[in-house]
Amino acid sequence: MRKARNFFFFLLSILWLPACGQKTFDEKMESLYRNTVPVIQADKLKDKLTKEEIYLLDTRAPEEFGVSHIAGAHLIDFDNFKISMAREIPKDAEVVVYCSVGYRSERIGEELLAAGYQHVSNLYGGIFNWKNQGNTIINKNNQPTDSVHTYNKNWSQWLYNGIKVYE
């Protein structure tokens, strides 16, 4: 009887851990976001990418983008961003920005909205959440990869599904 009870609690804890991790991830996102740019969930973006023309902007550093990015994304380096970099994008086009977790991309999204872009959204949880949800990413050679540049060891804790690359 005692073994069965211990096994039950062990099984319950295993089932409970993933939900706990997502809650913690969501709490972290809530603490980072200013909620100044609408968010789009990974599953909705995945669906839209197959049906609509979307300008997908990766706002991470070039070395992060080189490790992996979402197929079809264009690099808009956060550290060197100028609104003129987006001049080729029509102001009424749908634009989705992302970074590692959504913090840097939200700042770029704010600038795009302030410049008159009408349909800007921020990928919730960034490329980390995209990959955590099991979606495909590609490397600089346009080949599928599981590697994600996690910025540093501290931020690596938020990537649950993939190979963590930093430094």
Give the location of each predicted region.
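Active-site-adjacent beta-strand anchor residues
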Residues: 58, 98, 123
